[in-house]
From Swiss-Prot:
Active site: D692 (proton acceptor)
Gene3D superfamilies, per database record: Phosphorylase Kinase, domain 1 (3.30.200.20), Ribonuclease Inhibitor (3.80.10.10), Transferase(Phosphotransferase) domain 1 (1.10.510.10)
InterPro entries in the record: Kinase-like_dom_sf, Leu-rich_rpt, LRR_dom_sf, Malectin-like_Carb-bd_dom, Prot_kinase_dom, Protein_kinase_ATP_BS, Ser/Thr_kinase_AS
Residues carrying Phosphothreonine: T561, T727, T732
Keywords: ATP-binding, Glycoprotein, Kinase, Leucine-rich repeat, Membrane, Nucleotide-binding, Phosphoprotein, Receptor, Repeat, Serine/threonine-protein kinase, Signal, Transferase, Transmembrane, Transmembrane helix
Sugar-bearing residue positions: N143, N182, N236, N258, N291, N297, N407, N434, N447, N466, N471
Family affiliation: Belongs to the protein kinase superfamily. Ser/Thr protein kinase family.
The protein, known as: Probable LRR receptor-like serine/threonine-protein kinase At1g07560
Amino acid sequence: MKNLRGLLLAFLVLSLGISDFLRAQDQQGFISLDCGLQADESPYTEPLTKLTFTSDADFIKSGKSGKIQNVPGMEYIKPYTVLRYFPDGVRNCYTLIVIQGTNYLIVAMFTYGNYDNLNTHPKFDLYLGPNIWTTVDLQRNVNGTRAEIIHIPRSTSLQICLVKTGTTTPLISALELRPLRNNTYIPQSGSLKTLFRVHLTDSKETVRYPEDVHDRLWSPFFMPEWRLLRTSLTVNTSDDNGYDIPEDVVVTAATPANVSSPLTISWNLETPDDLVYAYLHVAEIQSLRENDTREFNISAGQDVNYGPVSPDEFLVGTLFNTSPVKCEGGTCHLQLIKTPKSTLPPLLNAIEAFITVEFPQSETNANDVLAIKSIETSYGLSRISWQGDPCVPQQLLWDGLTCEYTNMSTPPRIHSLDLSSSELTGIIVPEIQNLTELKKLDFSNNNLTGGVPEFLAKMKSLLVINLSGNNLSGSVPQALLNKVKNGLKLNIQGNPNLCFSSSCNKKKNSIMLPVVASLASLAAIIAMIALLFVCIKRRSSSRKGPSPSQQSIETIKKRYTYAEVLAMTKKFERVLGKGGFGMVYHGYINGTEEVAVKLLSPSSAQGYKEFKTEVELLLRVYHTNLVSLVGYCDEKDHLALIYQYMVNGDLKKHFSGSSIISWVDRLNIAVDAASGLEYLHIGCKPLIVHRDVKSSNILLDDQLQAKLADFGLSRSFPIGDESHVSTLVAGTFGYLDHEYYQTNRLSEKSDVYSFGVVLLEIITNKPVIDHNRDMPHIAEWVKLMLTRGDISNIMDPKLQGVYDSGSAWKALELAMTCVNPSSLKRPNMSHVVHELKECLVSENNRTRDIDTSRSMDINLSFGTDVNPKAR
């Protein structure tokens, strides 16, 4: 008998016979990536399938684009005419955001098409996370092949990796994910790798989306030994079992031409030990006469029998084996056998067959993965090997890591991190402390600045720390020095500005590798302080607050004269705004660099103390989400702060005006502002509390990147274990933490409260205080609205419902947690940043799930010897 594969190769094109409006369906949850499509190309609707594809550039950080040549006798739809190939690295991985615990149909398409003019068809492995999924062999399937699996992700991140196994270059044409119902296609263990999916018909039509709402590909298959049944009546496919079989698949069926014979389908397996699941979809599509009976048993070998089965008239049902079957000799035989009392032969409309694929290797501990990826992002690392799972499989371990492996079912843990000689800049980032099993840290021979963070002493697992050859400064935390006495190996050689006491003026010999401050540098600093002290002392004694002679500003930033301030602002020609400090003017430095000049008003409620606080803070901190201080003026009665100019002004202005900020931009702004606060709380030593977080103190540049501003009320905590300080209450009404107001006890959680209020502004576009509401304060109003359970009445109506409801709910819940009356129940800013980034990922994923309509078949085969054949 003729093998089904030969027939499948003949049926290449899907006819388009139904009008578009009948075919229109929802692609909610679909991910359709055109691999190799240029990053700057917009998502497009494929003209034949009407499926919406987008570039894969945002989901992978490696690879190059290629375009296939024309293949005689083959026609490919647009997504399969370009590809991404991977000449560099062994493992190259896509990272997709998915819903944990959801059943997904995952499809990967591969077309070589001699894109490189080498006529060298590749062969490589395909992985899901740390486990092998299948081998892609384009040497055997020269016209292209399709890999398909039904899989339930264990986390919200799914990694699909192409792994080089020989000398040829891996490639991929398209990547597609389709959510399925969670009560369908459930094996006893593992995932289901598709062997074939066919509907029994003599037509040439392949059925997929939108007739199939899950975009399963149903290829036509029929043999001469069979008799075709067809109906023009409606077949009810709304079966309670949830398989959603398309009606086009079940309006035809096959029965044996010889009514006494069984209906038999056989297929070969690649490996004799494969375990098989078969799903039979049956519906009686004939109106049976009173004396007619159709009843049959199903046999899949000596030990597997099921029945009798009597298909329901014009109602589809799905039959499947609940336990996997092993086919003797690697050949499966499925028979539908007529029972003695049946007057009609057996009937079958469609069949799917799968083998189980076990994924025994656990992924690396989720917290370790999150931490190492945050470190990668913070330092802007771009290592070709840093793709996929950090620790497994072991032969693909990320460069610079070592991991601990217990067994395959236990998630590996990261035990050492070596980023020596990696051109790192910036501070030692706080995400390191989230590697809770880290034993060795090597950041030597980089250009790291800032201090040695206190959190290193709190990492109980750390045994070795190498920070030598950097530009670290300040004193080494005493707690860390105490751990050296208890066996910690600490190397800080080659950091000339690092010392071992808070005064940084003594040489200690009790440390492994002491650091000596340069006496010449110290003398220069003292001279600068003295000079500035003299200048400040000359200021008018009429100024309110502590005299300059009592409090000087230590700085290495540019100090401008008042005449220079007049020149850069053209005598204060253009006003940008007004704040508690005074007027803010636009200016230019050197005629090119735009700046904002904040001039202290003689009547300002803020005075020299807050001016000094802001200057000193901005001189010792740097973060991309904090406004940068360009310089200052301190000349007699003239005080001015000179900042980088932020083109789009403050966030509050955008909410009070007519401009509309999209939901994704709002989330980006929230992430930026939260990251700035996180740096103040964790990245600074001692930690800094802003004390005046509000929407008017969040400035936006030309790309809508947000930066925190106005640090005049900020407070540094003393070094030690204190969780709060007692201080006079300062801040802005509406944003002010009630607990801080009542107790005078300030902590970083006071900033968290204020940020929660800002986040509610971002979500609702409502004023913080509105006495026309039943609940004047925004947090109380939102709390009231939440009792009604309708988020649409809370979200800013300017958004017109264009947002991912999941991300909106998550952001709203986060904001309400931040404004909890009890500071103990509020999250820290690191948690806030993490949650907001997840909201952002969900929203970005939504923009790729665009509704489309019709579908067309692909023209690729399943591969060799995995398709059924009739007998």
